[in-house]
Amino acid sequence: MAISKDDILEAVGNLTVLELNDLVKAFEEKFGVSAAAMAAPAAGGAAGGAAAEEQTEFTVILADFGANKVGVIKAVREITGLGLKEAKDLVDAAPKPLKEGVSKADAEAAKKKLEEAGAKAEIK
């Protein structure tokens, strides 16, 4: 019997966050792809109507790691759950999106934690 799409969705839905992280890494290794979110193309004329609505999803951007690189790496690990190497690579690549599609409260908390560690962060 073949596994259906619904069976896969049900199985993935029952995984913990750590198990999902391991699954994503396994997909990246097996298929040679990256799970990094791609930038969406800019919308043309429809952007005017959407601007009137209140923004509900925010992106936290690590603009600069400042003088305390080690502290910023620790903060990035806490915020994202990344491993040490991945967090260091992300900090080294600043400016870089750290979290995407999060609520305003989560974005503010992440920005505060980064700034307390000595980094410069932005919310878009």
UniProtKB/Swiss-Prot annotation:
Keywords: Ribonucleoprotein, Ribosomal protein. One of its GO terms (cellular component) is cytosolic large ribosomal subunit. GO terms for molecular function: mRNA binding; structural constituent of ribosome. InterPro entries: Ribosomal_bL12, Ribosomal_bL12_C, Ribosomal_bL12_C/ClpS-like, Ribosomal_bL12_oligo, Ribosomal_bL12_oligo_N_sf. One of its GO terms (biological process) is translation. Disulfide bonds: none annotated. Pfam families: Ribosomal_L12, Ribosomal_L12_N. Belongs to the bacterial ribosomal protein bL12 family. Homodimer. Part of the ribosomal stalk of the 50S ribosomal subunit. Forms a multimeric L10(L12)X complex, where L10 forms an elongated spine to which 2 to 4 L12 dimers bind in a sequential fashion. Binds GTP-bound translation factors. Forms part of the ribosomal stalk which helps the ribosome interact with GTP-bound translation factors. Is thus essential for accurate translation. This is Large ribosomal subunit protein bL12.
